[in-house]
Amino acid sequence: RPYLFLYDDRFAVSLAIFDLDNTLIADDSDFLWGQFLVDRGIVDKDHYEQANKKFYEDYKQGTLDIVEFLHFSLAPLARHDAEQLYRWRDEFIDSLIKPIMLEAARELIDRHSQAGDTLLVITATNRFVTEPIVKLYGIDNLLATTPEFKDGRYTGKFEGTPCFQQGKVELLRDWLAESAE
């Protein structure tokens, strides 16, 4: 199921909720970001590539330790200044993400947008990777794990609840409560 459509007459709001990976795009953006880092020599090829594949398999099998994975996947952000990271991210989006954006997803999003529905993406992939992808679809609302950013740098840690499994439900509940105010 590509998305969830909710209508709540108490608030007169129609909400279309989308996943990102293998729904709006034809692959997994988190895994592709890791491969991008390996291919550009930004991270140690042998260690990072092997670990990235293992975490992706764990994810597909439903056995992923999200905290362990976030420590792994966010660590490269702490090793480089933000401006360099943004340049790499732009290159990543142009070279690996734009070619796999799904036309059917764009059409569905456009239909919901034209109907006046509120659009929301909920993803287990971190906000650093996903925010520009979601913006390409014209969606302003995103629930994703937020990498910690202090003193102009990413720390390699995350803020709040990871947006994964039950965490997605908790973050959605909080978002709905905030949106109703």
Labelled PLM ranges:
Residues 28, 80, 167:
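Conserved active-site and cofactor/substrate-binding residues in soluble primary-metabolism enzymes
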Residues 56-82, 141-147:
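Short, compositionally biased "basic patch" segments
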Residues 68-104:
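Metal-dependent phosphoesterase signature
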Residues 11-61:
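Active-site neighborhood of HAD-like aspartate-dependent phosphohydrolases
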Residues 1-12:
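N-terminal amphipathic/basic-hydrophobic helices that include classical n-h-c signal peptides
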Residues 44-45, 66, 119, 141:
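Residue-level detector of short coil/turn "hinge" positions at structural boundaries
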Residues 87, 94-120, 124-181:
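C-terminal cap/substrate-recognition subdomain and adjoining C-terminal extension
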